Structure formats: structure tokens, C-alpha cells
């Protein structure tokens, strides 16, 4: 049996070819479906939609984009790994898998305060930050739905 392995047609093949508007729309749509399922009391559907979101290529791509474009993008964790190149960012998307994932220890840095003392700062690895962002995408709609409307 001679089979050809191909990537799905709608999935990007490189960092530069990712359609960011489509990715944001996909994640936003899944988040809205999570909110609707929560309001309707369909908790199994909420869980299923959260699973879909955390395993989707677009959500992983947005998580990596967010981590690599924020203020701490040049601060490495204990693994001293930074995702600066488009190739490195695309490989990071592929690495964001729950199976076998184990968070790394935090890198501890002490930064000076105004009074001369030092304040501890814990820095996670890029992979840990991206994984946190990915799961934030799935949990944030619930937090907003269940939060106090006056807060």
C-alpha cells in the first residue's frame, strides 16, 4: 500500500504563511461557543470545545505569537531557549503537545527595588509560557462568563 502523507490543506506550512486573521477568528469562534455551551448548561460540550481549542493548530500558533511578541520575549528560562526566527516559532507550534509535557523549573532572577533590596523574579521557559497562554484561551471564556458582572 503506497500512501502519500500530506498536511491538511488549510494548515500553514511555515510561520510566514499563517493567516493570522483566520487564526484569530477561529479561536474567537470556539471561545464564543464555549460561553454559549456554559450558559446553556452543556458542560460536556464545554469540555469538548476546550479540548478542540487546546489541540487546534491556530490556537497553538496564536499562543506562540503572543509569547514571542510580548515584553518578555527576549528573556529565556532555565533552558536558555528563545524563539526568534520564523523557523523556531513554527517548530515551537509543533512542540506544543500535552502528551509528555512536563513544566521546567523556573529561572530565579533577583531585580533591585528602589529601596536597595532585591526582589525575586521567576521566569518560565518559552514552552511553558506558550502552554499557559494556550490553556488561557480555553479557560478565559469560562472565567468571564462566571465572574461577577460588577467586577
Feature map (PLM): residue ranges:
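Conserved pre-catalytic core of RNA-dependent polymerases
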Residues: 22, 30, 34-151
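Intrinsically disordered, low-complexity and often Lys/Arg-enriched segments
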Residues: 1-25
Amino acid at each position: 500500500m503506497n500512501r502519500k502523507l500530506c498536511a491538511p490543506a488549510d494548515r500553514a506550512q511555515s510561520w510566514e504563511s499563517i493567516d493570522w486573521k483566520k487564526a484569530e477568528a477561529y479561536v474567537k469562534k470556539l471561545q464564543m461557543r464555549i460561553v454559549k455551551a456554559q450558559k446553556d448548561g452543556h458542560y460536556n460540550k464545554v469540555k469538548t470545545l476546550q479540548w478542540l481549542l487546546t489541540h487546534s493548530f491556530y490556537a497553538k500558533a496564536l499562543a506562540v505569537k503572543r509569547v514571542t511578541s510580548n515584553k518578555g520575549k527576549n528573556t529565556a528560562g532555565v533552558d536558555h531557549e528563545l524563539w526568534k526566527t520564523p523557523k523556531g516559532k513554527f517548530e515551537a507550534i509543533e512542540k506544543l503537545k500535552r502528551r509528555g509535557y512536563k513544566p521546567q523549573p523556573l529561572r530565579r532572577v533577583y531585580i533591585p527595588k528602589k529601596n536597595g533590596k532585591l526582589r525575586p523574579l521567576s521566569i518560565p521557559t518559552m514552552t511553558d509560557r506558550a502552554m499557559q497562554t494556550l490553556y488561557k484561551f480555553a479557560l478565559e471564556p469560562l472565567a468571564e462568563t462566571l465572574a461577577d458582572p460588577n467586577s
